[in-house]
Amino acid sequence: MKKLIALHLVFIATFYTYSQSLKTLATATTNQNIIDYVHSVDSTIIVIDFLQLKKSKWKSTFKTVSGLILSGGKDVGPKNYGVKDTFNLCITDPKRDEVELFLLSSALNDSLPILGICRGHQMTNVGQGGALYQDIPLQHKSDIKVIHRDSLQENYVYHDIELDTTSALFEIYGTRHLNVNSFHHQAVINEGGSMRTVARAADGICEAAEWGKGLDDRWIIGVQFHPERQFKTESIHTKLIKAYIEACFP
C-alpha cells in the first residue's frame, strides 16, 4: 500500500509551464531533472506548479506546502530590484516573477525551508531587497577571468567555486572546493535581507548564499549552479537535496 503523502513541495517550472496533476508527478512534461532530483530522496513528494493555478488559489494552496524550491529559468525582471534594463539584454517572465515573489514572501513569513537554484538563487535575494548584475561581462570587473556561460548559449560550462567553511553549505557538502556547472549571465551583487554569500568563483562572483547564522534556525540556501543536472554523475550533489528535504520533513 502506497504510503500517505506527508510532504508537499512547491515547484515553479523551469523555462516552460507544464500540465501538472496534483496527485502525481507522472504528468510532468518538462524539467524532469528537478523532479528526479527531488525523487532521488523521496519519490512520494507531490510537486505543485503554481503557474498552473489561478491567483485566487495561491494563498489556500500554499497553506498545504512544507517547503519552496525556486528553480532556474529566464532573467529576473530588473524592476524587481529597482533598476531599468540598462543593456536591453534581459529576457524576462513578469508572470513568473509575480508568482515567485508571492511564494517567497509566503515562505519567509511561514519560516519554510527554501532552496533556490540559479534564477531561484537570484530571486531569493532580490525578493528580500537584494540586487543583481544585469550582465556579468559588462558590469563585473576582475583580473581573473571565469566563463559563466557558453557564448553560444547552448551548453553548460564548468568552473571551480570555494565555499565558506563556516557555512551550512560547507557542512552539507563537506568540502571547501566544488567544480560546478554554469549557465548564467547575471549574478547576485548585493545579498537581500539576512542572506550572506557563502561561495564564490575565482573572479569573486557570488555562487551561493544562505540565511545568516544566529538569526533563527530557518533553512534558506541559494546556489547559482544546477545540482539537479550534476547529481546523477556526481553524487555529492545529492547531499544538498537530502539536507533540504530533511529540513522540510524532519
Task: Tell me what each language-model feature is.
Residues 182-185, 194:
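Conserved beta-strand residues within beta-sheet cores
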Residues 118, 184, 226:
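Active-site glycine-centered loops adjacent to acidic/histidine catalytic or metal-binding residues
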Residues 221-225:
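Active-site-proximal beta-strand elements of phosphoester/diester hydrolases
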Residues 2-11, 15-115, 125-133, 137-166, ...:
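N-terminal beta1-alpha1 cap of cysteine-dependent amidohydrolase-like domains
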Residues 175:
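Active-site nucleotide/adenylate-binding loops and adjacent lid/helix of ATP-dependent enzymes
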Residues 217-219:
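C-terminal closing repeat unit and adjoining cap/tail of repeat-based domains
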Residues 179:
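Phosphate/adenylate-binding glycine loop and adjacent helical scaffold
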Residues 121:
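The feature captures the ABC ATPase H-loop/switch
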